[in-house]
Amino acid sequence: MASSVLLVLSLFLVLLLTQASAELFFNFQTFNAANLILQGNAVSSKGHLLLTNVTHNGEPSVASSGRALYSAPIQIRDSTGNASSTPTSHSYTLQQIFQNVTDDPAWLFALVPVDSQPKKKGRLLGLFNKSENDINALTVAVEFDTCHNLDWDKNSIAVNLGIGSVPWNFRDYDGQNADVLITYDSSTKFLAVSLFYPITGKRNNVSANVELEKVLDDWVSVGFSATSGAYETHDVLSSSFASKLSSLDECPTGENLLNKIL
């Protein structure tokens, strides 16, 4: 078996807006299943969030897929159509076993429809049902793709927005901490991602114009999705999220904070 490597990522997402008054905040330094919607192979173990399966030897399982969402719906835009301001931060651990793979491993921070179910595994990342533009997905995600697939990936290992990507040579930064800053400015509709390695000072950037209010429902679920092709494991160590709106509407009928494990 080839050697394994470890990457710890701290992800900071900031969606910036000029108007903000109603606020929502949560902070998980450890994870409790009672506060989460766990789907597919995702589990909470010893305070960590494990998105994909591992074998009894601690190696990644083939074709594993999992999603973990905060159990309360999040209002992403108000009744006037304004998008929200949402700063959030997360820390991750990825462990890779380098070998031949049949599916693309990747992990994502995602905004998905409330009560949505996991979609197809592998290259569709548990978020989509088809490879073409899936207009029914109503999903926005930032993908960290640690496997280069010649058929699908135009660049090397990459940070992707779906509508743009930047090469990310994961193997050059084995075991290093990385900080990710994601910002959305609703006045300019500009979404930007910056991946920074403090030890080396190396930074990668990708950006795109996205009208979140035209892509997402008023209410969304916030969380993570990951897939594995016998290549890597995906652990979330901590997470915090805040949302600010000019006004806060009533939560959709029938939605609550109860845990759902699927």
Curated annotation (Swiss-Prot):
Q: Does the keyword Aminoacyl-tRNA synthetase apply?
A: no
The record, for InterPro entries, names: ConA-like_dom_sf, L-lectin, Lectin_LegA_CS, Lectin_legB_Mn/Ca_BS, Legume_lectin_dom, Leguminous_Lectin
Q: Which organism is it from?
A: Phaseolus lunatus (Lima bean)
Chain segments annotated as coiled-coil in the UniProt record = none
Swiss-Prot/TrEMBL keywords = Calcium, Glycoprotein, Lectin, Manganese, Signal
Q: What is this protein called?
A: Lectin
User: Which PANTHER family does the UniProt entry name for this protein?
Assistant: CONCANAVALIN A-LIKE LECTIN FAMILY PROTEIN, LECTIN
Signal peptide stretch: 1-21
